[in-house]
Amino acid sequence: MALTTYTELKASIADFLNRDDLTAVIPDFITLAEAQINRDIRHWKMEARSSGQQSASDEYMQIPADWLETIRLHLTGTGTSVVNLISRDAMADKRERNEDTSGTPMYYTHADGQFQLYPTPAADTDFELLYIQKLDALSGSNADNWLLLDSPDVYLYGALIHSAPYLAEDERVAIWAQMYGASVARLNEASETAKFSGSGLRLKVRGLV
């Protein structure tokens, strides 16, 4: 059976489970697998860029809706200046000691689902964010994504292990978990190899949402 679309993935999971009573919850298994995959996989195909302009006097920067993890944040107006991540305590300390001064942002921290910048931008500031993005979730209106096309085994075994609560002491669950772990490890390793092999990597460019 081909495994290149959401419909084909659901059919394959149903075949592996061989349980007619679980058909309705298979989409939930896939959703749970995607949540776990977003935690487990760091692949160059998940890298994306988002560029924009931060308004003067606004210390809080919006994060893209599909953001998982920051690789690098830098300013792009005149040359390139990296904005470094610091802890919330360090941010609070800087603002307390320097009375929330304004200037060119040099640091950021995570605050309430946003990036808090320091110093607060004194002028409109252009930036570019390089980050790890979430998978495009599969659904009836989104038949595939790069992971399903490249590594359908990750999706298949990831979904199957989330059927465990319905299968009691089924020995297959442990096998599926091993297969999932091995597939994830190979995918992450292949990504690291590609990064250092001179392969041409192309990033997706997203606007802030």
Where are these regions (language model features)?
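Glycine-enriched, solvent-exposed interface loops adjoining structured elements
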Residues: 1-209
